[in-house]
Amino acid sequence: MQLQLICEDPSQQSHLDELAARWQLSHTDDSDFALVLTTERLELRKVDEPKLGAIFVDLIGGAVGHRRKFGGGKGQAIAKAAGLNKGATPTVLDGTAGLGRDAFVLASLGCKVQMVERHPVVAALLDDGLARAKHDPEIGTWVSERMSLIHASSHDALEQLAQDKDFLQPDVVYLDPMYPHPENKKKSALVKKEMRVFQSLVGADLDADGLLAPAMALASKRVVVKRPDYADWLDEQKPSMAIETKKNRFDVYVKASMA
């Protein structure tokens, strides 16, 4: 993929070059997007809309850190959907990792989470945030033990992993495909910013319906699909149950009990 690659600290240029090679990114001055390596982190900027600010992964502080400390623990809807309220600590594969927030919540509650992210820029941002979190004195130990990243197309990855006899099947496959959101729906300023940037960079997951079948084949216990409250069921398949919040819905497709 081509976009602007900018290094703010000349001494870090070789690191940016390594990132570009790893994620198969190349520089062009013509892109509206810039992947910027600052002295602190990797971030994405929309050059033609500087007021949007930068997008980066922060698993230590901010909203994610606040949710880890005060977010309701295993009583959260996502935790219930994944089966944590039944006394289990399932292994999870997040097939649409994005910026890693939901995966981090599940990991903070004890789950081992493997994350799949198919877009190279998003994967690069997530990998950078994950690396910083692993070095944090407060959360670094368990982040290192419980969170890992796979960069691959979700469809291909789920299908290939399901056929891989050496791959330990996760108890839960979690999916949160990007969904085109109506302009009249209220979102937080942060989510609006990220959705605008991501939908122009990545686009909506128009092939998301194709994720459910390989996810069902891969998960040993259940598949959890996060949807906006106004969205249809994924692939028009009725879930076993749904857990609803104010703005979202977790559709749960049960294959086996969590016991």
Swiss-Prot record:
This is Ribosomal RNA small subunit methyltransferase J. It catalyses: guanosine(1516) in 16S rRNA + S-adenosyl-L-methionine = N(2)-methylguanosine(1516) in 16S rRNA + S-adenosyl-L-homocysteine + H(+). Belongs to the methyltransferase superfamily. RsmJ family. GO terms for cellular component: cytoplasm. Specifically methylates the guanosine in position 1516 of 16S rRNA. It comes from the Bacteria. One of its GO terms (molecular function) is rRNA (guanine-N2-)-methyltransferase activity. It is found in: Cytoplasm. Coiled coil: none annotated.
